[in-house]
């Protein structure tokens, strides 16, 4: 599906209570996660839910926004990305180390949020950003604000003189 013109059939609706029950599990394989998500679909003919469905569901806020902002990624992908994020955002966000998307990432994000319930969002290092709130507007405005902070930081940075030289194997 193209997110620029996605229609309702491309947005698989799930039973949130069924998905949230998965939070109690210690382990869940990718195959079992997909099966559980498909079992929670309101319409069995819908496409598979996103690999990040659990992550959204495990955060308790009413509205959860998530993006892979170029600006945030440009900051977090630095060797000292976690330090830069702490400098930029202070206590407004909590940082989550990189973990492949799926059950383990969802569990990690939920644990990080539980330790920091007053944050406006989560920065997932080398992945993206989540913001949340009790209204869609609050979650959205937090997203715009936090991404803008990263954009301003990048605008102040001096560009690198060159990238490391690489070659394809022969």
Predicted regions, residues:
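Glycine-rich flexible loops
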Residues: 1-170
